[in-house]
Curated annotation (Swiss-Prot):
Organism: Mus musculus
UniProt protein name: SID1 transmembrane family member 1
Transmembrane segments: 310-330, 443-463, 495-515, 542-562, 573-590, 601-621, 627-647, 684-704, 711-731, 742-762, 792-812
Matches recorded under Pfam families: SID-1_RNA_chan
Coiled coil: none
Length: 827
């Protein structure tokens, strides 16, 4: 028995010795596992660029190991392709890729969710692994990449695996790179800033608009968000159909490099496309949704271009100041010479008499109130207290009570002026105290300043919020820029679009200076009791001109605010003061020959508020709602008729609930009972043409329902303004009045500059009417100084055209300064 025990100990001694030695405990386990492994298992040293096929199930899992080496200064990436013929969504093939610091996993078929619970399945998936960076200190970096393929399918799922190295992972500068992507096969590449480049523009182009895609720029960090549901989690991104462009600055990337990610969306809804018709629930979509892309990264402009472009903008508009100063000096020299020669005021007004003389045979007896005694007309006559029915006052006395506004109802009460005279002259409609009327027109100026302050401050706050949201979220679909020519500065994404509005501010201020000079000269003439300032020419009331200058400046400010982040929500920032400018110009034209019966500032600005409200409603509801266009067209036509009635009857036709009954009576008596010639033929012709134009606009909108309602409304205002201005100039020439060289030059300059401005306006570099991706299809390169685009040139030219337009209104009747007011016809 003892011998048997000794024999057993001797047999077990080698095993005990091996167990006591460290490191020998795992060896039998490893050998045992190796014995249990399938000899065909490819996990033992898998190769790149080789296709591996296999079947995985609940009891079978395959692991592949790849040895990847990264060298200093060389960035390479690995891409994993997995394809599965299994369409069972309950038991997909699960792929897990393990790297040194990262884990990436997905399933095949890959499932994407769309709108309204729609799903899209992709049975071929390719993903790029986040590259590991080798440094000079560590030398070549070797790492193992494990690809684990598994499935919970009870009967097995077939798959194919291919792992490749990306040869062209780093994008070059100024070289186009072509590639293909799909929703389940996203792509991303690396870009490093060159040493001499501070900013770059990523330009992406595709020949076909769809499928919709997303271009994203992300910092060098893992994981890289390259799927539809997570691409918006990091970095800067924008949707794309045919074009995309992102401007980046080196200072925003600490490592001076970034990833450019390209993701194809499973649906085109975000880009303005229609829904795909999914015939088979488990259909493979890769072939249908692949997209060929071309990416080019080019250096952006340098800081010197910013400085040069800014100085260019300032000097261009400062030249207008120099030109106006030169004109003032020339005018001053000529005035001094005339004063020395004694020739000023020597004109007797011949040739300035109106062609439309009073026809006494056709007027009722005793209706010669306000008629002209031509034998006494002389520009050299002295002041008469009975002339014009008012004494002369100096404007130095500013103590005018508010009640004074309604203390002179001559025009309202003396119906003979309106009802019995066939031909009116300016003296008939300039009978109120000049100080009171001037105060009335100054309300336009003070009210527009109040409106501008209360309007601009919340606008600025809102656009700053928009810009902050864009910078924080990286969502460049919020703002509709021309991304191919959007140059950032500080927190602003498109500084060039803001700088180009400087012209409105500078030229608006210059116009205010010109009006102020004229105002001061006129006040001095009144203080000196100059006969020409008191009884000759168009009565000088500068309140509307001041309001026009402020409106021009505010148009520049609000246009700049709009271009901080132009989009669907803030379009009215840019258009509201355009309506006001057009309206003020029409009011000024009417006030020129009707100084005592013009609209009050309160009713005028209230009308502008109604117009802006209608514009907002039109943009919101006017795209598809027929009922809105019916209501708007009815309002448009009725407003045109009401305004025409007021203009024709010089404000004597009251607008109240009985207007329709009175209008029917007038129509019956004047047009049906006895068809008589209109009393005011010229006015009637203008109003008929104006109504035809406005009714045409109304029916055009009702039939075609234009999508850009804001531009449609602005077109109505501009056409009415041009029509009224053309009528005014024609009637002025028809009345044998002269047009001096300065207004002729301003008219010609206005026509030329407006034509050029409209050419650039209709280039349509972006549009918030569609999706951001559709808007980017219209983007174009810069055309001026590599800094300004076509829309910036529109800003320059439109500011200049508005300035010349204002000068036309300011100087058009300068020839009447030596003509008696009772010889200036009203039209």
């Amino acid at each position: 028995m003892l011998d048997c025990l000794r024999l057993a100990l001797l047999c077990a001694l080698p095993w005990l010795l091996r167990a006591a030695v460290p490191g020998h405990q795992e060896e039998p386990l490893a050998k045992s596992a190796e014995l249990r492994r399938d000899p065909r298992d490819p996990a033992r040293g898998a190769d790149f660029d080789r296709v591996y096929s296999g079947v995985v199930s609940l009891s079978t899992e395959n692991i592949y190991s790849f040895n990847h080496t990264s060298h200093p200064g060389q960035v390479t990436a690995v891409r994993v392709h997995v394809n599965s013929s299994s369409d069972n969504l309950d038991y997909p093939v699960l792929v897990v890729v393990r790297q040194q610091k990262e884990v990436l996993s997905w399933q095949v078929p890959l499932l994407f969710q769309g709108l309204y619970q729609r799903s899209y399945n992709y049975q071929e998936v390719s993903r790029t692994l986040c590259p590991s960076k080798a440094t000079n200190e560590t030398g070549p970096l070797e790492q193992l990449i494990f690809v684990d393929v598994a499935s919970m399918a009870p009967h097995g799922a077939h798959y194919k695996l291919l792992v490749t190295k990306i040869k062209h992972f780093q994008l070059p500068t100024n070289v186009a790179f072509y590639f293909t992507a799909s929703p389940s096969q996203p792509q991303y590449f690396l870009y490093k800033f060159p040493e001499d480049v501070d900013s770059v523009i990523i330009k992406v182009v595709s020949e076909k608009a769809y499928p919709c895609s997303v271009v994203s720029v992300q910092n060098i960090m893992c994981p890289v968000y390259d799927l539809d549901h997570n691409v918006e989690f990091n970095g800067v991104y924008q949707s794309m159909t045919k074009k995309a462009a992102i401007t980046l600055q080196k200072k925003d990337f600490p490592d001076e490099q970034f990833f450019v990610v390209f993701v194809i969306k499973p649906e085109d809804y975000a880009c303005g496309g229609s829904f795909s018709i999914q015939e088979n629930e488990n259909q493979t979509w890769n072939l249908q949704r692949s997209k060929n892309l071309k990416v080019t990264i080019v250096p952006s402009i340098k800081e010197s271009v910013y400085v040069k472009s800014s100085l260019f903008s300032i000097f261009v508009f400062l030249s207008f100041y120099l030109g106006c100063l030169l004109v003032v000096l020339v005018h001053h020299v000529r005035f001094q010479r005339k004063s020395i020669d004694g020739s000023f005021g020597s004109s007797d007004g011949s040739g300035n008499m109106a062609v439309s003389h009073p026809i006494t045979a056709s007027t009722p007896e005793g209706s010669n109130y306000g008629a002209i005694d031509e034998s006494s007309s002389s520009p050299g006559r002295q002041m008469s207290s009975s002339d014009g029915g008012q004494p002369c006052h100096s404007d130095t006395d500013s103590s005018v009570e508010e009640s004074d506004f309604d203390t002179m109802p001559d025009i309202e009460s003396d119906k003979n002026v309106i009802r019995t005279k066939m031909f009116l002259y300016l003296s008939d409609l300039s009978r109120k105290d000049r100080r009171i009327v001037s105060k009335k027109y100054k309300i336009y100026f003070w009210n527009i300043i109040t409106i501008a302050v209360f309007y601009a401050l919340p606008v600025m706050q809102l656009v700053i919020t928009y810009q902050t949201v864009v910078n924080v979220t990286g969502n460049q679909d919020i703002c509709y820029y021309n991304f191919l020519c959007a140059h950032p500065l500080g927190v602003l994404s498109a500084f060039n679009n803001i700088l180009s509005n400087l012209g409105h501010v500078l030229l608006g201020f210059l116009f205010l200076l010109i009006v102020l000079r004229r105002d001061l000269l006129h006040r001095r003439a009144l203080e000196a009791k100059d006969i020409f300032a008191m009884e000759y020419g168009i009565p000088k009331h500068f309140g509307l001109f001041y309001a026009m200058g402020i409106a021009l400046m505010m148009e520049g400010v609000l246009s700049a605010c709009y271009h901080v982040c132009p989009n669907y929500s803030n379009f009215q920032f840019d258009t509201s003061f355009m309506y006001m400018i057009a309206g003020l110009c029409m009011l000024k034209l009417y006030q020129t020959r009707h100084p005592d019966i013009n609209a009050s500032a309160y009713s005028a600005y209230a009308s502008f508020a109604v117009v802006i409200t209608l514009t907002v409603l039109g943009v919101v509801f006017g795209k598809n709602d027929v009922w809105f266009w019916i209501i708007f067209s009815a309002i448009h036509i009725l407003s045109s008729l009401a305004l025409s009635t007021q203009i024709y009857y010089m404000g004597r036709f009251k607008i109240d609930l009985g207007i329709f009954r009175r209008a029917a009576m007038v129509f019956y008596t004047d047009c049906i009972q006895q068809c008589s010639r209109p009393l005011y033929m010229d006015r009637m012709v203008l109003l008929i043409v104006g109504n035809l134009v406005n009714w045409s606009f109304a029916f055009f909108g009702l039939i075609y329902r234009p999508r850009d309602f804001a531009s449609y409304m602005l077109g109505i205002f501009i056409c009415n303004l041009l029509l009224y201005l053309a009528f005014y100039i024609i009637m002025k020439l028809r009345s044998s009045e002269k047009v001096l060289p300065l207004p002729v030059f301003c008219i010609a300059a206005t026509a030329v500059v407006w034509a050029a401005a409209l050419y650039f306006f209709f280039q349509n570099l972006s549009s918030w009417e569609g999706t951001p991706a559709e808007s980017r299809e219209k983007n174009r390169e810069c055309v001026l100084l590599d800094f300004f685009d076509d829309h910036d040139i529109w800003h320059f030219l439109s500011a200049t055209a508005l300035f010349f337009s204002f000068l036309v209104l300011l100087t058009l009747d300068d020839d009447l300064d030596v003509v008696r007011r009772d010889q200036i016809p009203v039209f």
